[in-house]
Amino acid sequence: LTESTFYILLALASEPLHGYGIIKKVELLSENTIILAAGTLYGALENLKKSHLVDQMLIQDNSRRKVYQITDTGLEVLSHDYLRMKKLCLIAESILKKGEK
């Protein structure tokens, strides 16, 4: 996963959100280091939908907003990528600590 798609999936892991909600949640989670433009977000969401990592929910209130939710497969991929990055960080930490000596 790219950093942006990781944050999009992470934002959706706690609750379904509409596009603007995803943008704001990603900004919050990333401490404003990831600022998604609308075009970038919707392109990423389309790719995530094609990969079956995100679904678009049907809204009954006649709203024009599209709400997205993470799928079970999306949660698995997010968890796997988290563990991959965690392992990478542990390896880097070990190497960098050796370099400090």
Residue spans of the language-model regions?
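N-terminal helix-turn-helix DNA-binding core of bacterial DNA-binding proteins
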Residues: 1-40
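A generic structural signal for ordered secondary structure
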Residues: 19, 30, 65, 93-96
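Conserved anionic group-binding/transfer micro-motifs
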Residues: 22, 41, 74, 85
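Short, well-ordered turn and helix-capping elements at secondary-structure junctions
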Residues: 26, 30, 58-60, 72-74
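Basic amphipathic alpha-helical segments that dock to polyanions
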Residues: 41-42, 48
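Beta-hairpin "wing" of winged helix-turn-helix
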Residues: 49-64, 69
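Basic, amphipathic "hinge/linker" alpha-helix immediately C-terminal to the N-terminal HTH DNA-binding motif
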Residues: 62-82
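Amphipathic alpha-helical dimerization/coiled-coil segments
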Residues: 76-101
